[in-house]
Amino acid sequence: MGSMSVWHWVIVAVVVMLLFGRGKVSELMGDVAKGIKAFKKGMADDETQPNTATSVPPVGPNDPVRTLPHQGAPGTAPQPPHVQPHVPAGDHKAV
């Protein structure tokens, strides 16, 4: 009683067909199929074309070590360190 039988799914399908019409459902399924085909084609293209722009050349044991300067997040300028101003001991004023 708790599980969905075949008849439940048949009734759901009939209600969907009545609400959306036969043409709309077939159009929607065609769009889904086109999307799946485009996804598979894109995945196949990625597998056949290795990305040579990001490939790193092999490093030998006698090659010099190259380092890159530290970079922050894109679009942010490096911030100078925050320094507290020095106030002499006798010159404290209430703000």
Curated annotation (Swiss-Prot):
Keyword Metal-binding attached: no
Residue ranges of the region described as Disordered: 42-95
Entry keyword set: Cell inner membrane, Cell membrane, Membrane, Protein transport, Translocation, Transmembrane, Transmembrane helix, Transport
Membrane topology: Single-pass membrane protein
InterPro entries: TatA/B/E, TatA/E
Cellular compartments annotated: Cell inner membrane
Bilayer-spanning residue ranges: 1-21
GO biological process terms held by the UniProt record: protein transport by the Tat complex
Chief localization: membrane
Superkingdom of origin organism: Bacteria
Gene Ontology CC terms, in alphabetical order: TAT protein transport complex
Molecular functions (GO terms): protein transmembrane transporter activity
NCBIfam families named among the record's database cross-references: PRK00720.1 (NF001940), tatAE (TIGR01411)
Family as reported in the entry's similarity comment: Belongs to the TatA/E family.
Function: Part of the twin-arginine translocation (Tat) system that transports large folded proteins containing a characteristic twin-arginine motif in their signal peptide across membranes. TatA could form the protein-conducting channel of the Tat system.
Quaternary state and interactors: The Tat system comprises two distinct complexes: a TatABC complex, containing multiple copies of TatA, TatB and TatC subunits, and a separate TatA complex, containing only TatA subunits. Substrates initially bind to the TatABC complex, which probably triggers association of the separate TatA complex to form the active translocon.
Name recorded for this polypeptide: Sec-independent protein translocase protein TatA
Gene encoding the protein: tatA
